[in-house]
């Protein structure tokens, strides 16, 4: 039985996930291809500001987890096996020294993915009375 291995090299995805959407799903797929498992870190921003231009955070930790789990399940990924989700403080800065043993990588996507906007998704949910 394969389980999430806390000692194994792992890709970190840090974000607000307000809400998790197709762009995040595609990023996850690239991440899991690198090491076989991913830790999704959810910044604790419900009802708070995540920084400049990041004040709109209506989804709770519980809702964010449900959104992530249900979407990843559609593509066959299981929490506790392929990934784990962790609540973390409202991280706004990441600093490091030299030779730390990890890298920062930006993934570039085509316009159909890069144009997805959580801001627009939240606005649409509000228009439909779902948020």
Please provide the spans of the model-predicted regions.
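Nucleotidyltransferase catalytic core that binds NTPs
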Residues: 1-131
């Amino acid at each position: 039985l394969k389980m999430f291995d806390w000692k194994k090299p792992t890709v970190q995805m840090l974000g607000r996930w307000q809400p998790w959407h197709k762009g995040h799903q595609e990023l996850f797929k690239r991440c899991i291809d690198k090491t076989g498992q991913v830790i999704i870190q959810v910044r604790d921003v419900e009802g708070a500001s995540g920084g400049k231009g990041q004040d709109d955070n209506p989804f709770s930790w519980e809702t964010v987890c449900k959104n992530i789990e249900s979407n990843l399940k559609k593509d066959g990924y299981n929490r506790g096996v392929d990934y784990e989700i962790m609540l973390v403080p409202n991280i706004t800065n990441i600093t490091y020294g030299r030779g730390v043993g990890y890298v920062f990588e930006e993934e570039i996507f085509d316009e159909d993915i890069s144009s997805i906007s959580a801001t627009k998704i939240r606005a649409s949910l509000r228009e439909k009375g779902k948020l």
